Amino acid sequence: MNFVLFGATKGMGRALARLLAERGERLFLVEHCIDELEASARDLETRGAQLPVRTAHCDLLAPATFAPALEQAERELGQIDAVIVTAGLFATQDKLESDPELTARILTADFTNTVLFCEEARKRLLARGGGTLCVFSSVAGDRGRKPVILYGAAKAGLSRYLEGLDHKFRRQGLKTICVKPGFVKTGMTAGLKPPPFAGTAE
């Protein structure tokens, strides 16, 4: 299968990309840091991904990069079978409460721009007759929690959007999967006290 992965250079995205590489899948990576993209591509090639693993610049904070990145993926892969989105930002509630600019950045990245990227992916998958859109949200959006009020609000909106997308387009061949991990020990959560049930990216 042909996979486009947004956010595969670190954390859960990297762990998932490595699993797909070990299965011998064909991968196309999109991310904002070119150096990390190229390093990840070479890593995945050594793990069994179909050669070559191509990449394209795509910045979650720059929606104008979404369509060109997916267009390049279509050209390189021939067709896209699945799009996986693990990209996102995080900040603690205390930091967000004291920094309106950071709050706007988190809400924009984790809700508005993630939805805009998914809309670009949705249109392309439906145009080819369907496919899979898998997006990582969070259990932080399931109910209001004091430590993650603002981050959780963004993830709540994202989860509802993905749920509606699946209801509307499943019969047209588009399968939308909303993954909601709990606390996972990654670079994003570094410095936070993990609960007893915390998992790892792997």
Residue ranges of each PLM-predicted region?
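Conserved glycine-rich cofactor-binding loop
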Residues: T9-K10
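Conserved glycine-rich Rossmann-like NAD(P)H-binding loop of the short-chain dehydrogenase/reductase
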Residues: R23-S40
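Substrate-binding pocket helix/loop in short-chain dehydrogenase/reductase
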Residues: D94-L107
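Active-site helix of classical SDR
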Residues: C118, A154
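Residue(s) in the substrate-gating loop at a strand-loop-helix junction
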Residues: S138
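SDR active-site lid
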Residues: D166-E202
